């Protein structure tokens, strides 16, 4: 059963207290918080003051995703703001190993994100030092984009690389995650589903979280359909 991390960037910030309450009371596992600087990605989102406020309201893990240049300069500030896990981008770090050591030394769980064009092999050397890996399944910076199908193969490749380390390293996916593609992602090896638009643009976000949480691998679904069809043939 995957972990579900609602991305608050897609939520209604006018009612952020209600959003936090809903996530707390739902089957969601983490809060996913996207920080954008307008340089590494085109958009600017929110920063440390908003994370501090969310941290006060959140009763679950705060997974902070830094889409910013020179993340090492602000790492201590994000720890102080309340980040439990801190994700930096491979593409922005000049000294990735040092960044990871810094995050861990401050008491946070380190993670690295890779953009759609970045091969998973680029993380081979740093992989044993990570708590999880974030595979971007859209180009970062904007919500509501369409899922990139090739991402499934990247998840499979990352799963194989992790198995070779002998460590328990989680795979997180973010971008265009929906009820339709979640089962295939889980089957490929995804452990954490980040979803924003899919959850917060629905009339019943709690139900969407429930359905994502209960995403079954595609092979399970096909087996169920075969059994169902056989039972119908047998008894009707």
Cite the ranges covered by each PLM segment.
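Conserved N-terminal beta1-alpha1 strand-loop-helix module at the mouth
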Residues: 1-87, 92-95, 102, 110, ...
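Conserved beta-strand segments that form the floor/walls of ligand-binding pockets within enzyme
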Residues: 3, 113, 134-137, 172, ...
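Short helix-capping segments at alpha-helix termini
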Residues: 27, 57-60, 105-107, 162-168, ...
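Short, acidic/turn-prone active-site loops that include or flank metal/cofactor-
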Residues: 91-93, 115-118, 138-141, 197-200
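Active-site/ligand-binding-proximal alpha/beta "capping" segment
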Residues: 139, 146-192
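Targeting/processing segments of secretory and organellar proteins
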Residues: 218, 222-233
